[in-house]
Amino acid sequence: MKAVCPGSFDPITLGHLDIITRAAAQFEEVTVLVTANPNKNSGLFTVEERMDLIRRSTAHLSNVKVDTWATLLVDYTTAHGIGALVKGLRSSLDYEYELPMAQMNRRLSGVDTFFLLTDEKYGYVSSTLCKEVARYGGDVSGLLPEVVVDAVKQKYTQQ
């Protein structure tokens, strides 16, 4: 079965990478799908930059590919014959947020959502928090893939 790991990934964190790696061990093919979230600002990285950082961070996973999509997620899964969505859950708050979307996606297309519990060492990690720490010169190594740490530092030194 093919699966999608959707998200804005601005930027990809080690928590995201852990979920993607675990999904890749369970599914024959995993597409990391960079989506535009209308509830979030335009972002630190462009969609193309995010896709490049994800490709570089997942290069060791032969069954992972990266794509982007700007409309309904279920339209992507239907168009590409994908039967599963994979989402990471850090806490019950994530579950409360993700459950109605999972139910709507199932209603619209029959796609199932698989929830993977985040490794406890990444339970507090979010792209937003990492950007906030990095913006003020804090150390985000151990929270982001190394290639992403370098890219984030470069972005903030340019501003």
Swiss-Prot record:
Site (Transition state stabilizer): H16
Gene Ontology biological process terms, A to Z: coenzyme A biosynthetic process
Catalytic activity: (R)-4'-phosphopantetheine + ATP + H(+) = 3'-dephospho-CoA + diphosphate
EC annotation from Swiss-Prot or TrEMBL: 2.7.7.3
Signal peptide: none
One Pfam family of this chain: CTP_transf_like
Localization per Swiss-Prot or TrEMBL: Cytoplasm
An MF annotation (GO) of this entry: pantetheine-phosphate adenylyltransferase activity
Record-linked InterPro entries: Cyt_trans-like, PPAT, Rossmann-like_a/b/a_fold
Family to which this protein belongs: Belongs to the bacterial CoaD family.
Function: Reversibly transfers an adenylyl group from ATP to 4'-phosphopantetheine, yielding dephospho-CoA (dPCoA) and pyrophosphate.
Subunit-structure text: Homohexamer.
Protein's UniProt name: Phosphopantetheine adenylyltransferase
Native species: Corynebacterium efficiens (strain DSM 44549 / YS-314 / AJ 12310 / JCM 11189 / NBRC 100395)
